[in-house]
Amino acid sequence: MDNLDLHTPMMRQYLALKAENPDILLFYRMGDFYELFYDDAKKAAALLDISLTKRGQSAGQPIPMAGVPYHAVEGYLAKLVQLGESVAICEQVGDPATSKGPVERQVVRIVTPGTVSDESLLPERQDNLIATVYQEKDRFGLAVLDITSGRFQISEPEDRASLQAELQRISPVELLYCEDFVDMALLEPFKGLRRRPIWEFELGTAIQLLNRQFHTKDLRGFGVEKAILGLCAAGCLLQYAKDTQRTALPHIQSLTLLQHSEHIQLDAATRRNLELTQNLAGGSENTLASVLDKCVTPMGSRLLKRWMHQPIRQHEKLMVRQNRITALLQQDLVAAIQPYLQQIGDMERILARVALRSARPRDLTRLRTALEQIPYLRDILAQQTSSDLTALLQPIGEFSAQLDLLQRAIIDNPPMLIRDGGVIAEGYNAELDEWRSLSDGATRYLEELEQRERESTGIDTLKIGFNAVHGYYIQISQGQAHKAPMHYVRRQTLKNAERYIIPELKTYEDKVLKAKGAALALEKQLYEQLFDELLPHLGALQLASLTLAELDVLTNLAERAETLNYVAPQFSDDIGVHIQQGRHPVVEQVLNAPFIANPVELHPQRHLLIITGPNMGGKSTYMRQTALITLMAYMGSFVPAESAVIGPIDRIFTRIGASDDLASGRSTFMVEMTEMANILHQATANSLVLIDEIGRGTSTYDGLSLAWACAEWLAKKLRSLTLFATHYFELTVLPEQLAGSANVHLDAIEHNDTIAFMHAVQEGAASKSYGLAVAALAGVPQSVIKLAKQKLAQLEKLSQQNADQRIQDLRQLNQTQGELALMEEDDSKTAVWEMLEKLDPDELSPKQALAYLYQLKKLV
């Protein structure tokens, strides 16, 4: 392959293009096929399940080859993108008629998982994001781009945990990183990793590139000028997007700095355990999104999921959302608005394809339909008394000129592709109408010619036809071919017929084909001009699509509130979560029986609830519903409860269930402890914390000790709003020792060999766990259950003899060792502080400074 002289001119052209795109598949256009060669062919054959063949030779060996037909390429690209592959599309750009040697070819675009915009390649109701991460020592910069909408954000996560949580939130399908990135373990869980050279992250280049993109002199207007690492990441990401699209990106019009303090933070464990958009098995069934998302537009569905994964903390913004939902319900507007929204479709992504000049004819008809709905929606909302609701559509501009353009230019039901012709409407362009008239007149002329030739020859089977190879022809059956006149020139012999050409037909063929070619060329030119006329209004159109998506989300949430009997939560400036008769939004939809609603009372004087009760009794459901109701409130949604008053929340943590992380070599217990450590380091008094069964996977005393210490730390030091479920009944004595803690339990009724779970939360500790009854329900053999009951009786008798002493010992340990440890920690901190206050660095010799460091080390 290195010696190009050994290859044909066409293969030399291929190898030169492949050298420019060495790491991705190259789809090389040859006639009606895209061909792949060498290793690309082998890889594509395996991934796409297509035939692997051979063509010519290289160094004496046949060249592997595989191909896909051009008209079916979108399906193959979709499969490759889903597998995380990138593909360079190489088209014939030269004219075969005038080319000497191989037709000129160019890579016209590069399809990557994070930069696709074609409708067939995208998940309709999910964001498709590409991200870039940059590291400088222990600091990070992150840039995120949705090329299908133009949303471009940067942030600077404060530490590794924050970066990991943010990456898990956005779940990029493609992730670029600098070649000197140190913490690769953070990135390994993500697919589509792309290593980029250091120079692509240079700050000066990034700022210059961004200013060119936004047509600005500096970036102060975006409020991002101080986010240096984020800008470095943004520069690399924007350049990558430009390189892959091979065109301008006019729909990327701004850059926003994501402020983490404005949102409730959710780590990966919390997103997983709360099953927001993905259940624990990896599917989408029985998730919060499956219940809440009945949006009628794909862009509304995507916006709802962004609200779900990034709840906002500002009560003022939340009340605007809530007031709009209330107004929609009070005025009974849902049924009036949703039919118009349904006609709008995915306006957001259509506009992105317009910006990239890749919009297809049917995209433009859908955009036309969307613009037709706006006046109706504006009229409906203008009649309302709610100022919040009437203000919603104010950002939407006037698009009558653009609507008129699309109504005049595009036919009602155009073909899929402009290359098929017949897209531009009659009357839009006089020259096009003339060429079409000449072309369309062929049918009438050919019918007249066919009738005339039948009469002059006396051949009743004579027909005039056309194919792409031979053009127009006169066909006569073999039985009457002997009657063909002398001036008929034979063009093709078939089994049952002969085909001829005559000078008159040939002249007309040249005329018609010229007219068709001219019409198609002009039509393509007019189609491109439509983009030129729409692009100056792109920013206003994008703002309209975002506003309409928000209206879809709010209308959807109003419908959900009415259908599912949700109420508007209240927000308080005081710390606490007060829920009356709360319900789990997902579980209540899948239960065949009525859901048992339960209250939650958490506030500074009652911030730790020790929850006990039987397995399957509802402890996990109770905790999850508390978190989901809180999260829904901070989305701006109504909530499944009789009433809810919720104070400021900065983070939601969950430590619910665990399994081995075999890929990382971590046991269940290690996973559990890692998640617990994250909570103990990150939680604050404004955090909502759910802990379920901490301390499993190790010895009883180890587990009990850890559970006790974690509960005490959360109650004393962090004072987080905590729901702490446990099977360690010894922990039920904690409320006697810890101010702000209380016991609650879920009960069950056992009768003979059956058990009925009550699912109602009651004050106080549970009396027993009903573990054997649950085991029987699970199908454990009765002989095993009987033996277990015997052993249980023996163990209970034995343990009862020293149960009181054991609890007393725990109480004593709590009062002495725990307090002593905290006191020692405080004492050591005080000593270090006092020593540092007395120290004057300017008066120390190097030897004295070293001595001081040793003393400080001892104190720590």
Swiss-Prot record:
Segments forming a coiled coil = none
Keyword DNA damage attributed: yes
User: One GO molecular-function annotation for this sequence?
Assistant: mismatched DNA binding
Keywords from UniProt, A to Z, are: ATP-binding, DNA damage, DNA repair, DNA-binding, Nucleotide-binding
Q: Which domain of life is it from?
A: Bacteria
List the InterPro entries.
DNA_mismatch_repair_MutS, DNA_mismatch_repair_MutS-lik_N, DNA_mismatch_repair_MutS/MSH, DNA_mismatch_repair_MutS_C, DNA_mismatch_repair_MutS_clamp, DNA_mismatch_repair_MutS_core, DNA_mismatch_repair_MutS_N, DNA_mismatch_repair_MutS_sf
Keyword Iron-sulfur listed: no
Q: Which GO terms describe its biological process?
A: mismatch repair
Which residues does ATP bind? Answer: 613-620
Task: Name the GO cellular-component terms.
Answer: cytosol
The record's similarity note reads: Belongs to the DNA mismatch repair MutS family.
Cited HAMAP family: MutS
Q: Give the protein's biological function.
A: This protein is involved in the repair of mismatches in DNA. It is possible that it carries out the mismatch recognition step. This protein has a weak ATPase activity.
PANTHER family per the UniProt record, alphabetical: DNA MISMATCH REPAIR PROTEIN MSH1, MITOCHONDRIAL, DNA MISMATCH REPAIR PROTEIN MUTS FAMILY MEMBER
Q: What is this protein called?
A: DNA mismatch repair protein MutS
Q: Which organism is it from?
A: Pasteurella multocida (strain Pm70)
**Annotated gene:** mutS
